[in-house]
UniProtKB/Swiss-Prot annotation:
Gene Ontology terms: biological process: aldehyde metabolic process; carotenoid biosynthetic process
Composition bias type Basic and acidic residues, residue spans: 1-20
Catalytic activity: all-trans-4,4'-diapolycopene-4,4'-dial + 2 A + 2 H2O = all-trans-4,4'-diapolycopene-4,4'-dioate + 2 AH2 + 2 H(+)
Organism per entry: Cytobacillus firmus
Protein name as it appears in the record: 4,4'-diapolycopene-4,4'-dial dehydrogenase
């Protein structure tokens, strides 16, 4: 087991690469066995992971299972079912002047991959990339977030006991440890976190020309037009916004509501919050907490930037912030410029879709965009305006749990994608082998007949 000094950490990728090259690229069966072992590890320690997630984020048990554990198990099953098809060699031939060019294409692992997880979903965001990396045949080092220490230490103990370090290793530590790791000569770095830290990781990796996949965040807009209001829509938005106490990178960040349904929407939001979490959400067993003191301070500062329509209470002693709805926010306020990443929902009225989209109030390259509407023209306008890699109509967040949908950002929300086949492709590169087949050409009845010599 390596120490966390700079020299030991920097030697990790070389040791994993040497083992990979000496053993050769793992067979599909070997990869499936590793993934099966990972699945067994998750299932056998489900209760321990649930306790750790509650200790780190106050996560309710069902929320831990549905948003962290179940999605990992589903991903492993999907990958194991389809990996043979994704890994299949393709062939093609092209006629050139005097010869046939034969091309064989096949995916190959990068080698040793570094995965830096985030604290908001510390189990899922540490292991989901690892599933794709293992499926592609790589060796992995996982650095979980130090801001979710219970989950990080549990991951370290369980994985390092179950896997040899040359295959899969968890390294815990602070930001300095992460800096030492990103300076090491890995073949690929996968990072999930803030844009500021993501830039630092990319800059460090660029010094060694190490490719990087960045999964960042952004201000995901959610629009309710004049046709989109319903109690079901409101409940969907409230669930998605306050899941994990708002600490979800694809949560609806700011809600834009057509003026004709604005008051009705506000009333229904309050009713839905009360239905989900009761009149005293601090006492609810279905509501989590903010992860760190610094993030708690940032989120409560947002509350004072508008009129509180619902909620607004907080308690620093256990980092509780009530589900909060804000109205009448001054244009240019920080809450309208920065990613909120907490249980505070600004609700902004608008009167015209085209005017809203051209106003600059909606971040075009957010991680995702949501619209609730029955108006096909409005839906199409929104789709054309957004640069994000996913647009969800009449639902929120569900796409992130599907292995059939690539998950990733555009522009300031990151680059690269994973989940399902996209993960297999992200952690592998295509090797093309070409062969020239010499031919003789005879012209018969105006046709060219190729005869291989």
């Amino acid at each position: 087991m390596p120490d966390n000094d700079s020299h030991s950490l920097k030697s990790l990728p070389e040791r994993q690469r040497e083992d990979l090259f000496s053993a050769g690229s793992p067979s599909l069966e070997a990869r499936k066995k590793q993934l099966s072992r990972l699945k067994t590890m998750i299932v056998d320690h489900e209760e321990a992971f649930t306790r750790a997630l509650h200790a780190d984020l106050g996560k309710p048990a069902f929320e831990s299972f549905s948003s962290e554990i179940a999605v990992l198990l589903n991903e492993i099953d999907h990958v194991c079912k389809h990996i043979a098809k994704w890994n299949r060699q393709s062939r093609s031939r092209y006629l050139k002047m005097g010869y046939v060019e034969s091309i064989k294409r096949k995916r190959h692992p990068y080698g040793s991959v570094l995965i830096i997880g985030s604290w908001n979903y510390p189990l899922q965001l540490s292991l989901m990339p690892a599933i794709g990396a293992i499926a592609a045949g790589n060796r992995c080092v996982i650095k979980p977030s130090e801001h979710a220490p219970a989950t990080a230490e549990l991951l370290k103990k369980i994985i390092n006991d179950a896997f040899p370090p040359e295959q899969l290793l968890v390294v815990t530590g602070d930001a300095q440890t992460a800096s030492h790791l990103t300076a090491a000569p890995f073949d690929l770095i996968f990072f999930t976190g803030s844009g500021q830290t993501g830039k630092a990781v990319a800059e460090q990796a660029a010094r060694q020309l190490t490719p990087v996949i960045l999964e960042l965040g952004g201000k995901n807009p959610c629009i309710i037009d004049e046709t989109g209001f319903s109690k079901e829509a409101v409940r969907e938005i409230v669930w998605g916004k306050f899941l994990n106490a708002g600490q979800t990178c694809i949560a609806p960040d700011t809600l834009f509501v057509h003026q004709s349904v604005y008051e009705k929407m506000l009333n229904e939001i309050s009713a839905a919050v009360s239905a989900f979490y009761g009149e005293q959400p601090r006492e609810s067993s279905d509501y989590g907490r903010i992860c760190t003191d610094d993030h708690f301070q940032k989120v409560i500062e947002f509350i004072g930037q508008g009129d509180v329509r619902h909620g607004g209470s907080y308690d620093r002693s256990d980092r509780f912030i009530a589900p909060t709805v804000l109205t009448d926010i001054e244009p240019g306020s920080p809450i309208l410029q920065e990613e909120i990443f907490g249980p505070v929902l600004p609700v902004i009225p608008y009167t015209d879709m085209r005017t809203l989209l051209s106003s600059g109030r909606i971040q075009r390259d957010a991680l995702t965009g949501y619209i609730f509407s029955k108006n096909k023209d409005n839906i199409q306008l929104f789709k054309e305006h957004m640069r994000s890699s996913t647009i969800s109509v009449n639902q929120v967040i569900h796409h992130a749990a599907s292995p059939h949908i690539a998950f990733g950002g555009v522009g300031t929300s990151g680059y690269g994608a994973y989940h399902g086949k996209a993960g297999f492709l992200a952690f592998s590169y295509e090797k093309q082998n070409t062969e020239h087949i010499i031919t003789s050409i005879f012209k018969v009845n105006s046709r060219h007949i190729l005869i291989q010599i």
